[in-house]
C-alpha cells in the first residue's frame, strides 16, 4: 500500500505546516516507526472434510489444535492473526453432503474463522441451503461480484473491516465468474456473476474513499494459473493482481484450482510439491498470492511485518495437518506421519462425532465388490478416458436404454479402490445429486453436439467421458463417429444420456432442456451407479477399460 502511504504522509505534512503548534489527530491509529507483526492463516477448498480420512489425516479437530497453538504462539510474541478461507466448503464427502455441510460451517465457527470467500460449490444447492449455512457461520461469507439479476444489487457482503493493533485491514471477497457455468443451473438462474477484476477495482476505489484502510486483502475463489495461462477457465488470481494498480491489493488468499501455490521462479510454479517442502508464494504486481492446496491438508501461514504503512512478508509456510507417507517396515508398507502428530481438539471432536456417526449409518453398507481400481482421480479423469468414467456412462446408458452416453469428468470426484464398495464410495464419486437425462436427436444434431462436447480441452471438468461411441477428435472437429459399432447416419435418430447439470448448459455444454427430444428421468446419478454396481457385482474393471475408442489427434 505504498501509494496510499505517500499520499497520507504528504497530506499530514501539509496539515502540520498549516497548523503549526496545534495538536492534530493523526490519520492512522498505528504508531510511526513501530514494527507490528501480522500473521494470516488460511485454508481453501474444504469440500466437506470435517472428519479425518481413513488414514487419520487432516480433519477439523486436528486443524483446530494447530490453529489454537499458532494463535497462542503469535500472540505471545505480540502479533495479530487473521484466519481466512478461500471457499468451497460444500460438496465432496457424503457425511457432509447429506447434512448440508452443517458440521463444516459450525466447525469453522468453533475454530474461529474471520471470513471466507464464496466458492462455486456453495451454489451446488438451492439458495435456501446457502442462507441456512450463513446462519450456521459466525463469520462473513464474502463476494463483491455476485448480483441479483432483477434488482441489480449485490447479494452478499462485499467486504469486512478488521482492526489489528490499530492497523485497518479491509478483506474483500471475489468468486469466479465461471460459477455461472459450474454452479447448478437450476439454482443460479437469477444470479449474475460479474467480472471479479472490475468489481475489485471498483470496490477498492470505494474503500479508499470511505474506510481508508491501511491494507487491503482479498479472499478469492478464482484459481491460480501459472503466469496467468488459464486455458478455458475464467481469469484467476494472477489476472486479478495484474489488472489492478500496483499496490492496490496487498494479498490474495485464493482457492478453486486446489493446489499449493509455491513458486520456483517468477511465473514458474514449483512442480511436485511435497509436505514439508519450502513454499514461496507467488507475487504479481506487488500482490502476494497464496493457496493451501485442498481439504484442510495444510494450514497456510504468512508472517508479515507492518511498519510506517509498508507491509513486508517475513516468512511463509504450508503446515501439513497430520499428512502421512508410506514407508517399508520389515518388508511391509505402512503410513507414518510426515511431521509430528497433531492431537485432535477434544471438544470439537466430540461436537462433530454425532454428525459423522449419523452419516456413516447410511453409508457404510457394502453394495458390491471390484477386482481392481476404478480410476477417478482428477489428474487422470480430466485428461483421458478411464474405466470409472466409462462405467458411470454405461450405467446411465443402460438405465435410459440409450445408444451412447456422455459423462463430464468434473462429475467424477474420486476413485473406487479394489475390494468392497460401499454406498459412501458411490456418493464420494458422485456427490452432486445430478439427475439422469436423455435426449433423442438426429444424427446431424448429434454430430453438432459432439463437435462442441468432444472437443472440450483436457484439464477441465468439461472434458467428456464416453460409452457406446467411438470417434476421432482433431482440429476442433469430430469424425469417424460410430455408435453401437455402426457409422453415424445423419438422418437416423439416436438417444444419448448426459447429467442434468450439463443438459442445463453446465460446463459450457449445449443446452438441451428445450429440445423436443429431451427427457428428465428423475433418477439420481448416484442411485443409478449404486444399482448398476449391485446388479453387476463382482465388477471386472477390465470390461470397462478404454480401448482406443476416442482418438485425439
Curated annotation (Swiss-Prot):
Q: Return the Pfam families for the record.
A: 5_nucleotid_C, Metallophos
User: In which residues is a divalent metal cation 2 bound?
Assistant: 88, 120, 221, 256
Catalytic reaction(s) noted:
a ribonucleoside 5'-phosphate + H2O = a ribonucleoside + phosphate
Q: Cellular component GO terms, alphabetically? A: cell outer membrane; outer membrane-bounded periplasmic space
Give the stretches traversing the membrane.
none
Q: Name one GO molecular function term.
A: 5'-nucleotidase activity
Provide the membrane topology annotation: Lipid-anchor
State its cofactor: chloride; Mg(2+)
Q: Which family does it belong to?
A: Belongs to the 5'-nucleotidase family.
Q: Which NCBIfam families match?
A: PRK09558.1
Per the entry, what this protein does is: Degradation of extracellular 5'-nucleotides for nutritional needs.
Descriptive protein name: 5'-nucleotidase
Q: Which organism is it from?
A: Vibrio vulnificus (strain CMCP6)
Amino acid at each position: 500500500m505504498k501509494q496510499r502511504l505517500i499520499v497520507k504522509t504528504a497530506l499530514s505534512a501539509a496539515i502540520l505546516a498549516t497548523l503549526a503548534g496545534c495538536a492534530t489527530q493523526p490519520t492512522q491509529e498505528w504508531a510511526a516507526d513501530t514494527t507490528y507483526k501480522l500473521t494470516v492463516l488460511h485454508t481453501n477448498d474444504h469440500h466437506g472434510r470435517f472428519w479425518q480420512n481413513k488414514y487419520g489425516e487432516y480433519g477439523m479437530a486436528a486443524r483446530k489444535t494447530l490453529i489454537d497453538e499458532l494463535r497462542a504462539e503469535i500472540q505471545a510474541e505480540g502479533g495479530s492473526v487473521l484466519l481466512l478461507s478461500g471457499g468451497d466448503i460444500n460438496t465432496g464427502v457424503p457425511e457432509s453432503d447429506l447434512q448440508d455441510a452443517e458440521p463444516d460451517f459450525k466447525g469453522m465457527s468453533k475454530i474461529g474463522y474471520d471470513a471466507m470467500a464464496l466458492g462455486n460449490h456453495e451454489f451446488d444447492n438451492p439458495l435456501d441451503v446457502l442462507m441456512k449455512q450463513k446462519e450456521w457461520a459466525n463469520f462473513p461469507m464474502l463476494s463483491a461480484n455476485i448480483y441479483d439479476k432483477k434488482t441489480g444489487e449485490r447479494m452478499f457482503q462485499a467486504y469486512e473491516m478488521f482492526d489489528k493493533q490499530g492497523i485497518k485491514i479491509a478483506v474483500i471477497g471475489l468468486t469466479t465468474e465461471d460459477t455461472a457455468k459450474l454452479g447448478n443451473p437450476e439454482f443460479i438462474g437469477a444470479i449474475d456473476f460479474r467480472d471479479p477484476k472490475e468489481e475489485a477495482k471498483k470496490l477498492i476505489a470505494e474503500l479508499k474513499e470511505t474506510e481508508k484502510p491501511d491494507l487491503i486483502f482479498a479472499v478469492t475463489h478464482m484459481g491460480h494459473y501459472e503466469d496467468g495461462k488459464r486455458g478455458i477457465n475464467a481469469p484467476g488470481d494472477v489476472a486479478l493482481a495484474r489488472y489492478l494498480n500496483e499496490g492496490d491489493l496487498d494479498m490474495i488468499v485464493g482457492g478453486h484450482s486446489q493446489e499449493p501455490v509455491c513458486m520456483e521462479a517468477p511465473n514458474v510454479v514449483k512442480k511436485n510439491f511435497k509436505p514439508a517442502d519450502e513454499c514461496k508464494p507467488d507475487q504479481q504486481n506487488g500482490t502476494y498470492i497464496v493457496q493451501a492446496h485442498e481439504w484442510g491438508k495444510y494450514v497456510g501461514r504468512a508472517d508479515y511485518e507492518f511498519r510506517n504503512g509498508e507491509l513486508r512478508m517475513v516468512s511463509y509456510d504450508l503446515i501439513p495437518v497430520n499428512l502421512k507417507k508410506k514407508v517399508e517396515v520389515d518388508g511391509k508398507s505402512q503410513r507414518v506421519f510426515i511431521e509430528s502428530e497433531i492431537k485432535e481438539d477434544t471438544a470439537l471432536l466430540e461436537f462433530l462425532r454425532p454428525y459423522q456417526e449419523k452419516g456413516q449409518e447410511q453409508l457404510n453398507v457394502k453394495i458390491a465388490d471390484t477386482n481392481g481400481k476404478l480410476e477417478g482421480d482428477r489428474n487422470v479423469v480430466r485428461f483421458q478416458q478411464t474405466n470409472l468414467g466409462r462405467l458411470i456412462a454405461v450405467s446411465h446408458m443402460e438405465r435410459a436404454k440409450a445408444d451412447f452416453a456422455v459423462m463430464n469428468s468434473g462429475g467424477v470426484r474420486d476413485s473406487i479402490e479394489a475390494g468392497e464398495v460401499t454406498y459412501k464410495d458411490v456418493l464420494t464419486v458422485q456427490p452432486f445429486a445430478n439427475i439422469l437425462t436423455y435426449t433423442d436427436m438426429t444424427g446431424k444434431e448429434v454430430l453438432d453436439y459432439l463437435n462442441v462436447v468432444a472437443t472440450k480441452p483436457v484439464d477441465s471438468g468439461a472434458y467428456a467421458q464416453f460409452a457406446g461411441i467411438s470417434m476421432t477428435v482433431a482440429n476442433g472437429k469430430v469424425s469417424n463417429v460410430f455408435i453401437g459399432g455402426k457409422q453415424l447416419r445423419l438422418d437416423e435418430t439416436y438417444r444419448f444420456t448426459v447429467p442434468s447439470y450439463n443438459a442445463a448448459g453446465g460446463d459450457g455444454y449445449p443446452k438441451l432442456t428445450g429440445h423436443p427430444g429431451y427427457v428428465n428421468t428423475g433418477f439420481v446419478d448416484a442411485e443409478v451407479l449404486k444399482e448398476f454396481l449391485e446388479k453387476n457385482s463382482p465388477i471386472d474393471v477390465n470390461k470397462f477399460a478404454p480401448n482406443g475408442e476416442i482418438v485425439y489427434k
